[in-house]
Amino acid sequence: MKIENNKVVVDTYAWIEYFNGTEKGEKVKKFLIEEYTYTPEIVLAEIARKYIREGASLETVKQRLRIIGELSVTVGIDYKIALESGKAYLELLDHSKKLKLKAKPGLGDAIILATAKVLNAKVLTGDQHFKKIKITIWIGE
C-alpha cells in the first residue's frame, strides 16, 4: 500500500537501472510499487537521448517513455521548480566541489533536485552529484 507521505522522484540513473534489469533496478522497481513516484520531464528527454544515441529503435524509446508515464507521475517545469532549479544548481555545484568530482552537475540534475524539494520528496538515484545529499535515496556504488 502506498503511503502519501512517501514521495520519491526517480532520476535518469534509476530508470536506466530499472530498464537494464539490474540488481539496482530491482530496488527501483520496489519503490515504483510501494511509493508515490514522480519523474521530472527532463528525465524523459535524457532517457530518449541515451537510447537514441545507443541506436535503440524509436519504438523501443517510445515504449520506455510510456512505461515511465504509467509507473510515475511526470512533472513539468513551472515557475516554482524553475526558481528552485537555480538554487539547486548552486547547491549541487558546491556539493560536487566538496566531493571533488571532476564533472560538474548539469541543469537536468538541478531540475531533478528542485522537483524533489518542491514536492517535499526524496530523490532515488546513484548519480554521484547526489551522493550524501540529505534527501537522496542512494542506490549507487
Where are these regions (language model features)?
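Short, hinge-like loop/turn segments at secondary-structure boundaries
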Residues: 54-58, 92-93, 140-141
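Active-site neighborhoods of divalent-metal-dependent phosphate/nucleic-acid chemistry enzymes
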Residues: 74-122
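Histidine- and aromatic-rich ligand-binding microenvironments
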Residues: 10-11, 39-40, 105-106, 127, ...
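Short active-site oxyanion
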Residues: 5-6, 34-37, 70-73, 117-122
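Acidic, PIN/NYN-like endoribonuclease modules and their adjacent C-terminal/linker elements
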Residues: 1-3, 113, 117-141
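A generic structural signal for short hydrophobic patches within well-formed alpha-helices
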Residues: 15-16, 44, 82, 130-131
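Short, well-structured N-terminal submotif of metal-dependent ribonuclease cores
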Residues: 1-40, 50-66
